[in-house]
Amino acid sequence: MKKKLPLNLLSALFVLAIGSSNAHAQSAFTGFYGQVSSGYESNQLGSLSTSSTTIPNINSDIKGSSASQSFGGTPLVLGIGHYWQANDKWLIGVGADYSALSQTSATFSRDSTNASGNTTIVAGSTLTYNGASMQLSNRFNLFITPAYAIDKDKLVYLKAGYSQVTAQYNRPTSATRTVNGVSTTTAATGGSQSSNQGGYLIGLGYKQMITSGLYGFIEGNYMGYSAPSYSTNTTTRASDTLHGVSSTGTRTLTHNFASLNTFQALVGVGYAF
């Protein structure tokens, strides 16, 4: 019986050593990675409110509004990052990704009414501006990504961080005035303005090794941004003197959107170095 004790003890230690080795096996995702993905992107642009104010006042101030817009398409997202092994089951990482394709809404219109105390839109008539749109481009995300290793070759992860997108507002290209059922369309100023909208990113994903280094993944991301706002100043035209003002003035036109957010559902492949 005494001779069996050392053998039993060695066997037990061997089993514990094997178990400890497996428990602390390094994840295949530890280190640098690069990846590419595509899928579907949905953008929600909040309702638009506008105002036109002229100084000195020539009784031509108006305000306008448009409904919220939804638009989407197929993105192309390029990503890089690095994972560190925190313990046997958890990794912590940092990453960055960039959306290489722009997304543009369908054109939309805005209906205008007189600002308080102004009468440039006469009773019985309407004024509608047509052909506006929004284009989103150059989206990039910077994030931290804690991950849980299901096993050496499988990973679930979260993403949280900062997102920025360039929002280009394309102003209306025409204006339609309807008086007593008769419509007349003329060219509008048009043009565009861009702003960089910052916000937050949250995401969830799953990665699985296909072969040594090569992996596939699925991912969902939500980005919420500050509301886009634009302002332009122009000099009142000589024809404005018909409203009783002989000197030139300044017209300020503002466009304020209520919100901007984006959802992405992605499928892709990557390589862990």
Predicted regions and their residues:
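Cleavable N-terminal export/targeting peptides
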Residues: M1-F29
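Short N-terminal segments immediately surrounding and downstream of signal-peptide cleavage
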Residues: S27-Y40
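Outer-membrane beta-barrel channels and translocator barrels
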Residues: F29, Q85-N87, D151-D153, M209-T211
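Transmembrane beta-barrel architecture of outer-membrane proteins
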Residues: G31-Y33, G73-V77, L91, S137-N141, ...
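Residues on the lipid-exposed face of transmembrane beta-strands in outer-membrane beta-barrel proteins
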Residues: V36-S38, L78-H82, A96-Y98, N138, ...
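Extracellular/periplasm-exposed beta-strand and loop segments of Gram-negative cell-envelope proteins
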Residues: N43-G73, A100-N138, Q164-Q197, S226-Q264
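Mid-chain, structured segments of secreted extracytoplasmic proteins
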Residues: L76-S109
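Alpha-helical membrane segments in multi-pass integral membrane proteins
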Residues: T184, Q197-M223
